[in-house]
């Protein structure tokens, strides 16, 4: 028997067959993961490892407030996103380039031997900006920034932008209007009336033509044509006068011989091709366009209504014109003053072609 007693066997307890190690839950693993990363971001280096130049810094200069721009969706208080990856504030200096950042960053007063540390310090601060709370680590609002430095940064930011003219208080609409008016006065000598321009741009529909101005135009066509009128206006008036000769002869017969002599067309002058369907703004906007030509071909102008006549006087009917061999005999290319004959309706065609009426049986859903 050994006098030292039984020898302890410490490794027998670890070799138990029924021992199962408990696995950590997800909450415990996440907590351990966050706790392992948070001290690395927040803890300060030990005092023994600090540079003596940093210890000798001015405490007032080291506590200078940072310039922070708070925009929509960004906070300045201590609020970190999921797993510390969400940035909630943005420094003004980060919007500028590195040269502007180094020129406008206040240099801390240090010794000459510590100048390399002072140069490297802004780089270290810029690296840890996303992990540090701007304006102090307390939960209160950040300190007020320095106004002169903020003004310099805004000026530098203004020079960086593409459109620096947007910052001064200028009335861009008024300047554009003055430029347009100055150009019009330099090219044409006057500013056109906006009401006349807008009236000429509005093209009336062929179905909704006003009847009273048409009658007034026919009545005014029998009057004298001023000499200073445009050439196309004279042609339109002469054509309307020619139409007035066969429509109301007793009205135009009372004109003077001098006026009748002014209505005579020169032998080498022809009527414009688009006089019947040309836009009312043709005289003001130059020669007719291709759109006016298509409109004159495919849109049939409605004839003006006959003027009121006494019961015993009837205007002479125009003679039927022989069809031209160059144009096909279609209603779209009919140049006669009479409107084309209306086409029969679809219901009439159906009733003539089908012996029974259109009737549908009741619809069954199933």
Curated annotation (Swiss-Prot):
Feature: compositional bias, Basic residues: 18-29
Annotated GO CC locations: chromosome; nucleus
Reported tissue expression: Preferentially expressed in gonads.
Region (Disordered): 1-53, 102-149, 256-286, 301-338
Compositional bias of kind Pro residues: 302-326
Residue ranges with Polar residues bias: 104-113, 256-265
Segments crossing the lipid bilayer: none
Subcellular location: Nucleus; Chromosome
One protein family per Pfam: Pro-rich_19
Domain of life the protein comes from: Eukaryota
Phenotype reported upon loss of the gene: Mice are unfertile in both sexes. Testis weight is significantly lower. Mice males show a depletion of late prophase spermatocytes. are depleted of post-meiotic cells and their weight is significantly lower.
Compositional bias (Low complexity): 275-286
Any one GO BP annotation for this protein: meiotic cell cycle
Keyword field: Chromosome, Meiosis, Nucleus
Primary localisation category: nucleus
Task performed by this protein: Promotes meiotic crossing over formation through its interaction with CNTD1 by participating in the crossover differentiation step of crossover-specific recombination intermediates.
Complex formation: Interacts with CNTD1.
PANTHER family named among the record's database cross-references: PROLINE-RICH PROTEIN 19
Name of the protein in question: Proline-rich protein 19
Species: Mus musculus (Mouse)
Higher taxonomy: Eukaryota, Metazoa, Chordata, Craniata, Vertebrata
